């Protein structure tokens, strides 16, 4: 034993005015102190900006304002420089967590994919607080769970077993009732697991989960009772059905490929345009003035052609119309009767047009001397 004055504690003298704890002993940090010069409306606006744009909660936003000595402009400028710790759960976060938990169970890594701003520790912490309050408040979930258990028990014999106390199921029932059920069903479950390996025991545990007892196919895949019966009727039936489905899939892919090729060929044809399919446009213009060569051709055609070939002959020149050509020819020659000045639709000119032919021929041989007798129309 350590006995003596040197082993005793030194007790200081009593001082009535001294405080028990000094400022140095206080390890806490002041994060907010109200300032009377800031109006409440302006403070609420600052908190709203910090929450909506930067994800701060009320305590973090006020702490930033207190750090800058109640200067709102400096606090707003400094808000983007820090990433707040998302510890506050909004109504949207709670709804997303419940939906993610119904899909993935206690797989918090998958739940975090739906709530990326929450850490795993925050998810676990909220899960246990939510689990405690859910059994007291969620009466609708409790009734739905009971009805689901009854339906599962009526559908198959595999789901008749009650939940085991060691399977970690998160039940919404009353803990006292659960304890009674566990005590009553403990012995039959233990006897049924004799001789089972570890894997068989784990598979048996998974069957106790009422929500996970039904194995659903992946998204986009649908199973019917007829298909399941057809597959299970014989050992080779599954391979036969799958081979047939593969052939149908290959044929559908070929049809799609052929349709793509036809569409690409049509697109290439459309890109070429319709210029090659347009009829050629004639650049010749109709001229009302007659040259000497045209007059000679018209007279020769009228002399050597009958009424049936007069129209194609007049269209062979390609410059003047037939009506204008016949009228201008006989008008420029010697005077003739009205019957001789017919167009292409009338009878061919008579013998009275013979002097005109001679005059035109003489005009071609000697233009100077023939100018009084025949001249082209003006």
Swiss-Prot record:
Listed Basic residues bias regions: 205-217
Residue ranges of domain ELM2 in the record: 1-83
Cross-referenced InterPro entries: ELM2_dom, Homeodomain-like_sf, REST_helical, SANT/Myb, SANT_dom, Trans_reg/Corepressor
Main location as per UniProt: nucleus
A GO term from the CC aspect: transcription regulator complex
PROSITE patterns reported for this sequence: ELM2, SANT
Gene Ontology biological process terms from the UniProt entry: negative regulation of DNA-templated transcription; regulation of transcription by RNA polymerase II
SUPFAM superfamilies reported in the protein's UniProt record: Homeodomain-like
Localisation: Nucleus
Record keyword Repressor present: yes
Spans annotated as Disordered: 147-219, 337-356
Coiled coil spans: 238-273
GO molecular function, one term: transcription corepressor activity
Keywords for the protein's UniProt record, in alphabetical order: Coiled coil, Nucleus, Repressor, Transcription, Transcription regulation
Signal peptide: none
Biased segments, Basic and acidic residues type: 162-184
Listed Pfam families: ELM2, Myb_DNA-binding, REST_helical
Domain annotation SANT: ranges: 84-135
Family, per entry: Belongs to the CoREST family.
Biological function: May act as a component of a corepressor complex that represses transcription.
UniProt-recorded name of the protein: REST corepressor 3
Species for this entry: Gallus gallus (Chicken)
Gene of this entry: RCOR3
């Amino acid at each position: 034993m350590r006995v003596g004055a040197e082993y005793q504690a030194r007790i200081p003298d009593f001082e009535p005015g001294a405080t028990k704890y000094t400022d140095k002993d206080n390890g806490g940090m002041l994060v907010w102190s109200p300032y009377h010069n800031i109006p409440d409306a302006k403070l609420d606006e600052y908190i709203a900006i910090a929450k909506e744009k930067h994800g701060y909660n009320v305590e973090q936003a006020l702490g930033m304002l207190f750090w800058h000595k109640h200067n709102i402009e400096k606090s707003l400028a400094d808000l983007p420089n820090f990433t707040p710790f998302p510890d506050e759960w909004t109504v949207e976060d709670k709804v997303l967590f419940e939906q993610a938990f119904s899909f993935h169970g206690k797989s918090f890594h998958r739940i975090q994919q739906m709530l990326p701003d929450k850490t795993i520790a925050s998810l676990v912490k909220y899960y246990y607080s939510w689990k405690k309050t859910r059994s007291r408040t969620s009466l609708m979930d409790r009734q739905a769970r009971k009805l689901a258990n009854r339906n599962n028990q009526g559908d198959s014999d595999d789901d008749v077993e009650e939940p085991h106390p060691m399977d970690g199921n998160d039940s919404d029932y009353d803990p006292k009732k659960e304890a009674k059920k566990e005590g009553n069903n403990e012995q039959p479950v233990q006897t049924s697991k004799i001789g089972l390996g570890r894997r068989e025991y784990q598979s048996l545990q998974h069957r106790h989960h009422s929500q996970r007892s039904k194995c659903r196919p992946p998204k986009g895949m649908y199973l019917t009772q007829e298909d399941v019966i057809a597959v299970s009727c014989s050992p080779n039936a599954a391979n036969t059905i799958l081979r047939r489905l593969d052939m149908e899939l290959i044929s559908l892919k070929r049809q799609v490929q052929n349709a793509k090729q036809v569409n690409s060929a049509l697109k290439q044809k459309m890109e070429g345009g319709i210029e090659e399919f347009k009829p050629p446009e004639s650049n010749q213009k109709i001229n009302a003035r007659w040259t000497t060569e045209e007059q000679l051709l018209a007279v020769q055609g009228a002399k050597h052609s009958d009424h049936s070939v007069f129209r194609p002959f007049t269209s062979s020149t390609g410059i003047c119309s037939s009506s204008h050509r016949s009228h201008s020819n006989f008008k420029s020659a010697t005077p003739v009767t009205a019957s001789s000045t017919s167009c292409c639709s009338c009878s061919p000119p008579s013998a009275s047009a013979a002097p005109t032919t001679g005059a035109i021929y003489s005009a071609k041989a000697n233009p100077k001397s023939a100018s009084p007798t025949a001249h082209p129309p003006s």
